[in-house]
Amino acid sequence: REIVFWTAASSGAVMPYADRMLDRLNENGIRTAVISNLAWSGEALTERLDRLLPNNKFEFVITSSDYMYRKPSRVLFDIALNKAGLAADKVWYCGNSITADIEGAHGAGIFPVLYEGETPGDINPYSGQNDGIKVDFEYLHIHDWRELIDVLEKIPR
């Protein structure tokens, strides 16, 4: 099975404070899901997420390998909106790539959040991927999941 192969190749790791951020979202009834350009299946990613972040309440996981589209194509975002039964203007999307995530979410009418966090002592294969890329629309740029918690706590409900 692909899960066995993927786990043997890389056991995965949790980004700092991701668990705390998910707890806060859950406590506030904020719905969550995943859209990934991953080549592994949604089933494999779900297994990994459930193992590494057992507190997650992701309603669904969408991967490129399951739908044959890659972000920034709005197709994946539209599928997610349809599954969630939500209008784009009610959704925020967090990702680490300006091209795939931020431009993709914006193109689908979703508010984009760029996460560019570093894990001390680890090599981040995504470091520098956004260098020199500029966009001409509003998005939230964070470097730590605690920043998102702070922003969300300031929004009146």
Enumerate the language-model features and the residues they cover.
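Hydrophobic alpha-helical core bundles mediating ligand binding, dimerization, or RNAP-core interactions
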Residues: R1-A8, S41-L45
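Short, acidic loop-to-helix structural element flanking the phosphoryl-transfer center
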Residues: I3-A33
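Asp-based, Mg2+/Mn2+-dependent phosphohydrolase catalytic module
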Residues: D19, D23-N26, A33-R157
